[in-house]
Amino acid sequence: MTKPIEKNMLRSRAIKLPEVTESMWEQVDEEHRNLVQEFLDAHSFRDKTRKQYYSSLRQFFWWVHTSLNGKKLYKISKRDFIRYQSFLKNRGMSSSGIALKKAGVSSLNNYIENVVAEDDHNYEKFRNFTRGLPAIPKTTTYEKVKVTYDDYKLMMDALKEDENYLGMAWLATAFNVGGRRAELIQLKTEILDYPVPEGQSYVMSHKVFGKGKGEGKPLEYMINTEALEYLRLWHEKRGYDHEYLFTTQYGGEPKQMSESWADYFCSDVLSDILGRRINPHLFKASCITYLLEVKKVKIELISKYVAHHEDVSTTIKHYDLRDFEEEKNQIFV
């Protein structure tokens, strides 16, 4: 009998909003549809951001069509948008999901306020109605349970037994380097030729692009010798050369790995090994927490060189999963 996976859920996941089909979209006010297309065409968004904005704007304007009787965008008020946020919240959407939907509308509004308003008298007095609203109450669907070093070794041992060299390379890099899934797949094979400087236990990667406007924020990651060891093993075993380290074969042709591979690998392989829910986003926090908790590295250094944050408070708020058990045990001694 298969061992059940511990989900670590704090609340039920929201049911996805129904897709806004093409026939539904055709019913939306033509001006709104044109504004969405103009906005997307005017910006050099990353593919992922573009898809998110396109989806969220279709959802918003379908709601405007059905719930606000197709009210023109320039007539929509802050109160109307609060109603939209309530609509999303009442369907169980998490605070991060609502924030993502809000971001798409806010970005469109900024474009209209700064560009469209100059040429369209209807928008002369238009203001971004998503600004200055009450903060969205934070909700958490899954408890973040850190991947410990023991968890990491257990997974690596299981992958070694399976001769899953790609999995070992990805896991060793994710746990030791702390990059996001979209950043890891940008690592190039040339890294394996970089010499490790004397007195160091890492090499600096070439530039990869992280989250941010346009192509994204340029980042360089510290690739330690343990990650390099398993990257070399994978390179040796895969049997072909390629510009990128993380590759998979599609129709017999090797191609750069997609972001979704990490989702599958974590949910269908690593989760079964540990018996609890594992997702790619855990590894950045787990890497940072391991360096803080076990290696005792100063958080200022980790924040700057591993997390790539300008403010240490961002690292503490989102990625420090320490439980401080040793300190707590001193309280009632």
Curated annotation (Swiss-Prot):
* Biological process (GO), any one: chromosome segregation
Asked whether the UniProt record includes DNA-binding among its keywords, one would answer yes
The residues responsible for catalysis, as annotated, are: R180, K211, H281, H308, Y319 (o-(3'-phospho-dna)-tyrosine intermediate)
Q: Give every Tyr recombinase domain span.
A: 142-332
Tree of life domain: Bacteria
* MF annotations from Gene Ontology: DNA binding; site-specific recombinase activity
* Every Core-binding (CB) domain range: 30-113
UniProt keywords (A-Z) are: DNA recombination, DNA-binding
Q: Does the keyword DNA-binding apply?
A: yes
What family does this belong to?
Belongs to the 'phage' integrase family.
Annotated protein name in UniProt: SPbeta prophage-derived recombinase-like protein YomM
Q: Which organism is it from?
A: Bacillus subtilis (strain 168)
